[in-house]
From Swiss-Prot:
Source species taxonomy: Archaea, Methanobacteriati, Methanobacteriota, Thermococci, Thermococcales
Family per similarity comment: Belongs to the FGGY kinase family.
Protein name according to UniProt: Glycerol kinase
Organism (species): Pyrococcus furiosus (strain ATCC 43587 / DSM 3638 / JCM 8422 / Vc1)
Gene name as annotated: glpK
Function field: Key enzyme in the regulation of glycerol uptake and metabolism. Catalyzes the phosphorylation of glycerol to yield sn-glycerol 3-phosphate.
Catalytic activity, reaction form: glycerol + ATP = sn-glycerol 3-phosphate + ADP + H(+)
Sites where the protein binds ATP: 12-14, 259, 301, 305, 400
Annotated keywords: ATP-binding, Glycerol metabolism, Kinase, Nucleotide-binding, Transferase
Residues binding glycerol, per UniProt: 82-83, 132, 237-238
Amino acid sequence: MDRYILSLDEGTTSARAIIFDKNSNVLGIGQYEFPQYYPKPGWVEHNPEEIWEAQVKAIKTAIEKAKIEANQIAAIGVTNQRETTVIWKKDGKPVYNAIVWQCRRTAEMVEEIKREYSDVIKEKTGLVPDAYFSASKIAWLLDNVPGLREKAEKGEVMFGTIDTFLIYRLTGEHVTDYSNASRTMLFNINKLEWDEELLEIFKIPDGILPDVKESSEIYGYTKILGPEIPVSGDAGDQQAALFGQAAFEEGMVKATYGTGNFILANTGRMLLYSDNLLTTVAWGINGKVNYALEGSIFITGAAVQWLRDGIKIISNAAETEELATKLESNEGVYFVPAFVGLGAPYWDQFARGLIIGITRGTGREHLARATLEAIAYLTRDVIEEMEKLIQIKELRVDGGATVNNFLMQFQADILNKKVIRPVVKETTALGAAYLAGLAVDYWESMEEISQLWRAERVFEPQMDEKTREKLYRGWKEAVKRALGWAKVVS
């Protein structure tokens, strides 16, 4: 009987399930969207029950489309939007909506903590203090949901990022992996354990925290599909994508183009620190931990969604390529999509979106092009920071926006580096599948996985240096004008 791996890819706007075979081929995909809720300006929430329902439907659809039986699934891997915070009771019922990674409700709380503890947090967690991470979200829930702090002190509730919530629902086990734990701002990445001092700073009882495991091991078994199936892979979405790109060697870099852009560089066993980038755990396997440098860009693909749903100048994302190629250049129009502040390398919670360079002749093609170019500029901002510490020859790319050939070519041009798009686009889900499969000997080794990675297209830089640097200077000027804007108008 042929065996397969089921990967659960729980994103910011949809839950997906993908069936992979031993050669990394996709046999079936299920995908269901779920809503985001915005109770106040800057607040972003999900209903965890809607995530679970969407995930279960996605699993069933993927199995149907793959035309396989549940007993052919050798293992399940989980990958997830990171930092998003859920607290639930022991019966699995959430006590409040999930607070999403994009949510800014705790920005002022974090600013206060940052003044006193910024260096401590950076040294222990590798993170820049920001409302983006889980710690302040947990603190907010404990302080604002009636009776929750008391329940937490008694050990009656559990905290988890979305992976932990899904694994608990699947297996009854309260666990996470190193990569997800490293995004909470409570996990010491040197000692690989929850940190007492950080828990004290945020006033979080340790009894609500999950056990931290390797990224590839059996966490428990699920009978949700009938037969007992091991759940044996877990990694945050960006770390999973790095693994799915087979970026196993030091200095290998990938960029995922999704709701936001996330650039990770494998630094091997080395903990490298940068003032403007995050240091994070890439994965833990076979008793060894790999670290990574990360640049997190909050809004990229979401800016394209805004063109479609916000100002309604396109009907679908693919239109942006067609519109952008109608112009020879951006004609001086820049768009800084700082809808929720700016992440790496700026780390300005108070930056806001800006479109500059508009004239009477500016049309929707200019806005479409400026949006795509912004994604590439933001990515270069991060790569330049990384190159202060490591040498980067090429960029492996994945995520929805990589189908946009204009964007990929412009990315190669503005970086002056090769941009390589793989055959298998589902690298995040594939990474979780690989981690799950390794734990049950479906794949024997990381060397075997490396042999499966194949390039679909290589984009070579074609732009002359003078044009490249002129465009980038314009971008830097536009960003300056966006920084701190929320403070100016508050």
